[in-house]
């Protein structure tokens, strides 16, 4: 294998007994057992137990001086462990190495965090000493898993006819989305490049250039605040674009890739079969309170507005009477039919800034089924029974209610649905459930600016007859706000993996879409001139999507923070503690770039 080793620390088995081998790696753990020294040697591939006998005086003396994380190379004979010392939890647990010679390749200082074991350590220490953190078993395994997933994606995409192309890292600033990371130009004073938020325009230009099927494991850069599932700096996505396709064609191409990928790395979990479930956006909001529903949770919300209209529960009845847009949504809670659970959910809702969470729980009383709680008392037995019948509830079940204008209350209702499902143990644990969210609204009403605006992606093709679309004006507001687009998200277990769309490749339709949203033609030409100009020279119908690599790896690794699947992440303040970035630069460098740093103004103290 090399002059340092004949085998790795993860490959030796009983079949190697009697062989003389060379290994190299890190001292993982050291133990003294009555004269013999035992050392677990670790490398990228696993652990092997080394045995040092005092009869081998030179090697033994050297072993006595070893400390954790020293790097050593050894030579010795593979011997079988005795029956009582076999370690069934270790792939190499049937053997050990009787060391005859050893060389210390590198020493290690006292460790700021342990590599052995998985203790919780402060994030700042873990990121400052990331090279040590990466030696820890779980994180090391996650990073290797990421590599395998990316390699498998590349193989699958190539096998179904996609070509991998690289797009520029230095590009123009984008007027849409998050803040750009700007790069000053030395050759063009006062002008800036931007790191790409996504290769969106480039991948569409690749379609215009006639390459038909493109993919890339694309780095994307956005100057935005961190979240558990979002880096403050860069992230990677499986960027995909296809020519001469409909929405159905895109789904048919990507579903086998994602299904096969997840099935391969699911570690025994099931993966929902394809074609994946398709849920219109409006239905997702109504049933699940979210456009990224977790379908492992069986709870489906229903409207029970009519059961409260004119009822004795004045809080809801009053809201319904005042505003025709108000709805009351019911969140069934199978098995949650006791006052303690209902009160706990009510307290949770108050902690979320809500006045509370109305509920009814059902119980058998004297052989009869009855609803209990303040809501049931106020609306009476007839309405209570109608709600129970509609939702199919039985004794021992409960139902919670959220009332208001859906646009304002849907998000909280979705949180309550998730909370109920989690608290009652209703969520399936051993499955990856995919779905598509389709039929997103093309436009929405911007209440702050009192105007029609784009709802999501301004470059999507409207799901509307194009000849009629070109004739629309602001007098057709209801028609415009009811229009959907060929936009879609793919969701797995409540995690949005990707947005995508069939693109608007027709300049006249694009001009019209921006006009409806209040943008002048000149603005479109200034901001998107490169792509728009290309569309004037024969553009095929095209569409695509871009599932996030980080989020897919997080799901498959079973972790909730992307720092557990990213090799060198930034912290929450967008700092790289290991490399000490961002940092100040030399005045000479700023001068070459024609830049002067102006310190931020200090805020005036009040009073």
UniProtKB/Swiss-Prot annotation:
Keyword Aminoacyl-tRNA synthetase belongs to the record: yes
Annotated residues for binding of ATP? 222-224, 496, 548-551
Region Aspartate: start and end of each range? Answer: 200-203
Q: Which portions of this protein are annotated as coiled-coil regions?
A: none
Q: Does the keyword Zinc-finger apply?
A: no
The UniProt entry, under CDD domains, shows: AspRS_core (cd00777), EcAspRS_like_N (cd04317)
Swiss-Prot/TrEMBL site (Important for tRNA non-discrimination) positions: 33
| Signal sequence coordinates | none
Q: What is this protein called?
A: Aspartate--tRNA(Asp/Asn) ligase
């Amino acid at each position: 294998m090399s002059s340092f080793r004949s085998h790795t620390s993860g490959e030796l088995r009983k079949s190697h007994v009697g062989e003389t081998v060379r290994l190299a790696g890190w001292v993982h753990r050291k133990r003294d057992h009555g004269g013999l020294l035992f050392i677990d040697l670790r490398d990228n591939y696993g652990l092997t137990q080394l045995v040092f006998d005092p009869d081998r005086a030179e090697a033994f003396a050297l072993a006595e001086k070893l400390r954790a994380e020293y790097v050593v190379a050894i030579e010795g004979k593979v011997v079988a462990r005795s029956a009582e010392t076999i370690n069934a939890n270790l792939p190499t647990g049937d053997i050990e190495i009787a060391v005859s010679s050893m060389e210390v390749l590198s020493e290690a200082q006292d460790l700021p965090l342990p590599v052995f074991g998985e203790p919780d350590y402060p994030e700042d220490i873990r990121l400052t000493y990331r090279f040590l953190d990466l030696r820890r078993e779980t994180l090391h395994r996650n990073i290797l898993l990421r590599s395998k997933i990316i390699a498998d994606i590349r193989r699958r995409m190539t096998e179904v006819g996609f070509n991998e192309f690289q797009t520029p890292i230095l590009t123009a600033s984008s007027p849409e989305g998050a803040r750009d990371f700007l790069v000053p130009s030395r050759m063009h004073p006062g002008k800036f490049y931007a790191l790409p938020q996504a290769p969106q325009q480039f991948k569409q230009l690749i379609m215009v250039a006639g390459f038909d099927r493109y993919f890339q494991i694309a780095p994307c850069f956005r100057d935005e605040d961190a979240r558990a599932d979002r880096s403050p700096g860069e992230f990677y996505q499986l960027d995909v674009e296809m020519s001469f396709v409909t929405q159905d064609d895109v789904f048919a191409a990507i579903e086998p890739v994602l299904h096969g990928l997840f099935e391969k790395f699911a570690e025994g979990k099931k993966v929902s079969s394809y074609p994946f479930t398709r849920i219109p956006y409006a239905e997702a909001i109504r049933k699940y309170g979210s456009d990224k529903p977790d379908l492992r949770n069986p709870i489906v919300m229903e409207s029970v507005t009519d059961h409260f209209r004119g009822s004795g529960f004045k809080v809801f009845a009053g809201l319904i009477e005042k505003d025709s847009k108000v709805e009351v949504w019911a969140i069934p809670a199978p098995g949650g039919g006791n006052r303690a659970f209902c009160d706990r959910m009510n307290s949770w809702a108050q902690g979320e800034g809500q006045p509370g969470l109305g509920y009814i729980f059902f119980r058998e009383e004297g052989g009869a089924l009855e609803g209990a709680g303040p809501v049931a008392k106020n609306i009476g037995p007839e309405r209570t029974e109608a709600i129970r019948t509609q939702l199919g509830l039985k004794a021992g079940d409960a139902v919670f209610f959220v009332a208001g204008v859906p646009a304002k209350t849907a998000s909280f209702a979705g949180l309550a649905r998730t909370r109920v499902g989690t608290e009652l143990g209703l969520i399936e644990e051993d499955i990856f459930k995919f779905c598509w969210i389709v039929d997103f609204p093309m436009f929405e009403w911007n209440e702050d600016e009192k105007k029609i605006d784009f709802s999501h992606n301004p470059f999507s093709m409207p799901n509307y007859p194009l000849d009629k679309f070109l004739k629309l004006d602001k007098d057709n507001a209801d028609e415009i706000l009811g229009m959907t687009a060929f936009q879609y998200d793919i969701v797995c277990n409540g995690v949005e993996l990707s947005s995508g769309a069939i693109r608007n490749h027709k300049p006249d339709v694009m001009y019209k879409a921006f006009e409806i949203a209040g943008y002048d033609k000149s603005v479109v030409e200034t901001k998107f001139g490169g792509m728009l100009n290309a569309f004037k020279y024969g553009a095929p119908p095209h569409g695509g999507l871009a599932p996030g690599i980080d989020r897919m790896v997080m799901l498959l690794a079973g972790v909730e923070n992307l720092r557990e699947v990213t090799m060198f992440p930034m912290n929450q303040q967008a700092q790289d503690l290991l490399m000490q970035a961002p940092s100040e630069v030399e005045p000479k460098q700023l001068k070459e770039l024609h830049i002067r740093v102006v310190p931020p103004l200090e805020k005036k103290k009040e009073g």
